[in-house]
Amino acid sequence: MKIKHLKYWISQTRELSLLSECVRKKFGCLIVDPDTNCVLVNGYNGGPRGGDRLCGGETCIRNTCNIESGTQNDIGCNHAEANAIVNSARLGISIEGKWLFVNGEPCINCAKLIAQSGIARVIYLEGGYLSNDGIAYLLKNHVGVFPVSLKDESSLRSVLQPTFKEVRIERSPFK
């Protein structure tokens, strides 16, 4: 994968987020195979498949209840990362060792799903979310975390370096 691909995938998360009907924030997520440079699945935040378009039916329940962004993550729509992971399960696509691109920091609930699913790296645009609990959780659970800026090539270059976890696996005597 090259820097131009990283820029493209990150920009595509922003485009994908435009499909969300959430009135508060719009997130898009892609899960990409770094070996083939192909998108496996995607997701954006919104109501459940076949259900209401918003978490409160025709209104945003988080707005109705005055819930501050970054808190009470169990209330509201399905997040982009969760939708992408669920889509992979629904379609029978393994995402273990793959890279997840999202246009904002994952919340703690999405971080738990990401770590459990076996995602190797999370590449995200900084500033999309008001909490860093999810980032701390991912780091604690050995998921590579890469905040990037489309204007900062050094942040993009760091994504292409092997992580400790990957280096350790590559040097395994059991291969």
Please identify what each model-predicted range represents.
Residues 1-175:
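Zinc-dependent deaminase catalytic domain
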